């Protein structure tokens, strides 16, 4: 993994301090999980470089993200859903895949051309998904058109991707970049790598004839709403300028269990982003040289991105429509009185816990 410079992140400060807090918070989790069952699986449709396609999304239950076990990102609670012990056997992972195929067969008329596999960590990290399992999964889905696999930049390797590309699959690597601003990624998200590492991962993916889908995080902790929106606008454009990065998924933060963000939320120190902030970014970056989409998980709830409660579903539907059509005019069809409050926040807010609207 990339190493943080010791003059910035000495013991007891910076990432070291974040990791210490995160380990204590994560240690409160005493739930256990079945290693033969996937964390989640669902059918949907996604916009891809080949157009809108039916998709099967799989979240494999692995031993979880290596970085999360060291402490990890301030907002990410996915490791709490992972099997305890750090590893899941090949046979159990393939049983999970069988369950996902059964789920698809029961609910879809035809196999989905797009397969998206996440592990709440790194699919390409062989501690999570052994090479044997990676090859078996590539074989299981070799008749589909496109695969998306999740990974931190460190593990993006042309040899690993060849398991899929050699079978004729179009491949995209989903990288949780979170922001193009290194300081925000290090100090607010507590993610260890630099933007230069993302660029290197894009180059490695290109060498394997694969593409990259960047995942950005709107409003990590310690950023005000206007600062978070501006960071996303800059980050989308910077990602779109990297050769090989053809899609940017800009997703608002939600409050997950066993995270620093949850601690801040309960103490009045964090408010998830306004839903209005998402169209603001999507409209401003519609001319970027990449497909830009957003998926507001938990929209309309106090722990997820939300407006006033009256217009949340309408704004969410407009965002989903934009994802498929890439037409910003859909946002002009949605209005609500609470947009005036959001405008006020965007003009005047300077603190990250939104005291102006409390």
Predicted regions and their residues:
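Surface-exposed cleft-lining segments at the edges of enzyme active sites
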Residues: 183-191, 218-226, 264-269
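Active-site-proximal loop/turn and secondary-structure-junction residues that shape catalytic pockets
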Residues: 121-123, 153-155, 179-181, 218-222, ...
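Acidic (Asp/Glu)-rich catalytic clusters
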Residues: 102-109, 135-142, 160-170, 203-209, ...
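Well-ordered, non-membrane alpha-helical segments in soluble/globular domains
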Residues: 87-103, 129-137, 196, 228-236, ...
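Conserved C-terminal portion of the radical SAM core fold
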Residues: 196-259, 278-296
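Canonical Radical SAM [4Fe-4S] cluster-binding loop centered on the CxxxCxxC motif
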Residues: 33-38, 42-95
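Core AdoMet radical
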Residues: 79-100, 104-128, 140-156, 170-198, ...
């Amino acid at each position: 993994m990339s190493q943080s410079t010791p003059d910035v992140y000495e013991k007891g400060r910076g990432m070291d301090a974040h990791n210490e807090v995160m380990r204590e918070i994560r240690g409160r989790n005493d739930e256990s999980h079945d290693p033969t069952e996937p964390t989640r699986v669902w059918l949907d449709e996604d916009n891809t470089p080949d157009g809108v396609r039916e998709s099967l999304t799989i979240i494999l239950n692995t031993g979880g993200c290596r970085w999360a076990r060291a402490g990890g990102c301030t907002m990410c609670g996915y490791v709490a859903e992972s099997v305890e012990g750090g590893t899941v056997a090949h046979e159990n992972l393939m049983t999970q895949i069988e369950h996902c195929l059964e789920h698809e067969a029961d609910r879809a008329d035809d196999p989905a051309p797009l397969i998206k596999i996440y592990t709440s960590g790194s699919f390409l990290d062989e501690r999570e998904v052994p090479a044997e399992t990676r090859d078996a999964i590539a074989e299981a889905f070799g008749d589909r058109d496109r695969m998306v696999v999740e990974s931190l930049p460190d593990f993006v390797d042309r040899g690993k991707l060849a398991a899929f590309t050699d079978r004729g699959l179009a491949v995209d690597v989903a990288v949780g970049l979170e922001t193009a601003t290194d300081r925000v990624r290090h100090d607010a998200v507590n993610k260890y790598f630099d933007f230069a590492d993302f660029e290197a991962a894009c180059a490695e993916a290109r060498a394997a004839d694969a593409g990259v889908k960047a995942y950005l995080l709107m409003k990590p902790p310690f950023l005000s709403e206007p600062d978070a929106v501006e960071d996303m606008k800059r980050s989308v454009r910077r990602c779109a300028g990297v050769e090989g990065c053809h899609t940017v998924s800009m997703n608002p933060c939600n409050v997950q269990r066993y995270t620093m963000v949850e601690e801040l939320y309960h103490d009045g120190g964090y408010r998830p982003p306004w839903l209005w902030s998402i169209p603001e970014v999507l409209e401003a970056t519609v001319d970027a040289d990449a497909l830009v989409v957003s998926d507001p998980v938990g929209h309309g709830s106090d722990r997820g991105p939300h407006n006033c409660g009256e217009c949340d579903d309408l704004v969410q539907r407009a965002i989903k429509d934009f994802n498929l059509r890439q037409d910003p005019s859909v946002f002009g069809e949605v209005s609500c009185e609470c947009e005036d409050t959001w405008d006020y926040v965007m003009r005047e807010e300077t603190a990250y816990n939104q005291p102006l609207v409390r």
